[in-house]
Amino acid sequence: PQTLCHNDAFRRNILHSDAGVVLLDWALAGRGGLGEELVSLVALALYYSGFTQEYAARLDQAVFHAYIEGLREAGWQGDARLARIGYTCGMTLRGLAGVKQDINLLIDPSQHQELRNVHERDSVEDIAAFFAEVRRFRLVRIAREARRLLAS
């Protein structure tokens, strides 16, 4: 199944209040497959939240579990494995697409100060190592899971 997806839902684009939740910046909105909406939420959170491989794994599981729970509460009776396939494949494919963006940021001196500020790292080398760790989670760990799910 497909649905309307925001495709850029992460903390800077999500406002919480007593009245509810509001999503900002719908420029990337479009159709998405089951599980796909989680990709930007998890992937971008990894760049802004004290990343470790353990943190990434916990975030991945917590977000996916809450997603399935929300689908169930809304009446969806589908196979959670299919949602996991959509999520892991999307995480891998978008992770590959983002490598070029990471490289462009790292080689552009005009971006370096902002990168240091945003990622709270002292050097471009530290930022590159940080980016590599995030990509390792997405392009090794999650890609392996996607491959395993697709093969079973």
Residue ranges and their predicted role:
Residues 1, 26, 51-55, 59, ...:
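Conserved aromatic-histidine-acidic binding/catalytic patches
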Residues 1-36:
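Active-site acidic catalytic loop and adjacent metal/ATP-binding pocket
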Residues 33, 79, 117-118:
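Secondary-structure junction/capping motif
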Residues 35-75, 93-112:
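Active-site activation/catalytic loop segments of kinase-like enzymes and analogous catalytic loops
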Residues 40, 69, 85, 89, ...:
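Charged/polar, solvent-exposed surface patches and flexible loops
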Residues 76-93:
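All-alpha amphipathic helical-bundle segments outside canonical DNA-binding/catalytic cores
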Residues 93-152:
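ATP/Mg2+ or Mg2+-diphosphate-binding catalytic cores
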